[in-house]
Amino acid sequence: MSIVVKNVTKFYGQQKALDNISFEIKTGEIVAFLGPNGAGKSTMMKIITGFIPASSGQVFVNGEKIDADNFEIKQHIGYLPENNPLYLDMYVREYLSFVASFYKNRPCKSVDEIIDLTGLKKESHKKIGSLSKGYKQRVGLAQALIHNPDVLILDEATTGLDPNQIVEIRDLILETGKDKTVMLSTHIMQEVQAICDRILIIDKGVLVADEKKSEIYSKVQRKRQIVNVEFDAVPDEDALAMAVNADSITRTGEKTWRIESLEEEDVRSSIFTFAVANKLTVLSMQKEEANLEEVFRELTK
């Protein structure tokens, strides 16, 4: 199922939280929704899931308009909110059975099946309030998945988890997302790199990027080149810096250097020329490209 957002604006009183947002997520895509705190990510997700209305604009899921009264289309959406609201006095199995009872028109997974899928088997007899943060997140993900939704909206699904738990939840999202349309917000860029096809970036309520993961880096043009090079012997550092017109040169290992240059022309050819002139062999050389953190900072500063 696709998600189509058309010219969505949202006001809270006089404050504009979203400003004329439009995008489309196609069936089967896993899309990251990034932005600083307070940028409007959670607001947009609440509008997509029908929890709150937009002030203007429209949202369509599978061609059907999302509004407060369209309960049928909401049956196709699984949602894990940022604060993961749970009934802490209920037992895990009891809670998931309770959630499943609301989706009578959906081919729900069995409680046992969803417990196995989300790694809750050992904790299923416990009250939710006694679980660790990681297992509470798993319960939240289980309730979002139990009705086998076609669309999955995950707001900070890995917040507060340790590295092992993050990898486990990431793998779970990848596995369950194979036949679903997934939109997730996160501050963990490695997560985006690992599982997402496309990236949306929002800042101050405005959509500032909508790119495939492989193309997002073109949004940032570095003002300097950074090259890491390894020689077979130690060169004269001053001579190397002069030959490549380096703005900065840092020794990073026994025979390795990190060279920064403001030159417009590719400095790698100058490094090779220097090596030949000084009877050196270049063992390795790599030009650093902009990373996702740089793109994020550049577009949201």
Model-predicted regions and their roles:
Residues Q58, I226, T281-S284:
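Residues at or immediately flanking beta-strands
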Residues S2-V5, K10-D203, L207-A209:
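ABC transporter nucleotide-binding domains
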Residues D171-R258, L262:
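ABC transporter nucleotide-binding domain
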Residues S110, D236-L240, V267-I271:
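Hydrophobic side chains in well-ordered alpha-helices
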Residues I66, K104, D232-A233, E264, ...:
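Short beta->alpha junction loops/turns
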Residues E263-K301:
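C-terminal coupling/interaction segments
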Residues G78, K104, G119, L200, ...:
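A generic structural signal for secondary-structure junctions
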